[in-house]
């Protein structure tokens, strides 16, 4: 019985405990004129950043920051600017140190991203625009690319 409890205690596990919006800003500097102009295909500048912060021995805050600027196709008129930092507290226990970076950079943001995407979409609709739909993000590919770049830099 004690052996079973020891195996359970050492079992790696993580879960999202709380999700929240840390920062949210939406601006439409060209309103109301932008709604009267004939619509054209907008130009989107998007920056997505992942941040991780250890809260205590068992908890990590993982946040996704989105900075988006949407302009008319000629770039002369800003339709809207969206800034969002959406975060979650993850309970992380018994994850081997060599796997922790991957859990925080891949698994956690993969769980968080659909909710972050929904907030961004809803805010743009509430601002009078079409839904701002971001493509799904392959966090594993980003993690592997960062690791490869890190290895190349240490080799030089």
UniProtKB/Swiss-Prot annotation:
Under the heading SUPFAM superfamilies, the entry gives: SecB-like
Which residues, if any, are the signal sequence? none
Q: What is its main location?
A: cytoplasm
Transport is among the record's keywords: yes
Single GO biological process annotation from the record: protein transport
Q: Which GO terms describe its cellular component?
A: cytoplasm
State the compartments where it is located: Cytoplasm
GO molecular function ontology, one term from the record: unfolded protein binding
Keyword Chaperone annotated? yes
Query: Any idea which UniProt keywords this protein has?
Result: Chaperone, Cytoplasm, Protein transport, Translocation, Transport
Describe the protein's quaternary organization and the partners it interacts with: Homotetramer, a dimer of dimers. One homotetramer interacts with 1 SecA dimer.
Q: Which family does it belong to?
A: Belongs to the SecB family.
Check the record and name the HAMAP family matching this protein: SecB
What is the role of the protein in this entry?
One of the proteins required for the normal export of preproteins out of the cell cytoplasm. It is a molecular chaperone that binds to a subset of precursor proteins, maintaining them in a translocation-competent state. It also specifically binds to its receptor SecA.
The record's NCBIfam families line, in alphabetical order, gives: PRK05751.1-3 (NF004392), secB (TIGR00809)
- Name under which the protein is recorded: Protein-export protein SecB
User: Which gene name belongs to this protein?
Assistant: secB
């Amino acid at each position: 019985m004690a052996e079973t409890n020891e195996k359970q205690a050492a079992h790696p596990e993580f879960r999202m405990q709380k999700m929240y919006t840390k920062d949210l800003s939406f601006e439409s500097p060209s309103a109301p004129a932008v709604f009267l102009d004939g619509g054209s295909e907008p130009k989107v500048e998007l920056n997505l950043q992942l941040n991780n912060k250890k809260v205590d021995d068992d908890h990590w805050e993982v946040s996704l920051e989105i900075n988006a600027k949407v302009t008319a196709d000629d770039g002369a008129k800003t339709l809207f600017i969206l800034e969002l930092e959406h975060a979650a507290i993850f309970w992380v226990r018994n994850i081997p140190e060599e796997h922790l970076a991957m859990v925080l950079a891949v698994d956690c943001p993969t769980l968080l991203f659909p909710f972050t995407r929904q907030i961004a979409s809803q805010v743009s609709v509430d601002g009078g625009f079409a839904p701002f739909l971001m493509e799904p993000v392959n966090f594993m590919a980003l993690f592997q690319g960062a690791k490869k770049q890190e290895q190349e830099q240490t080799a030089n």
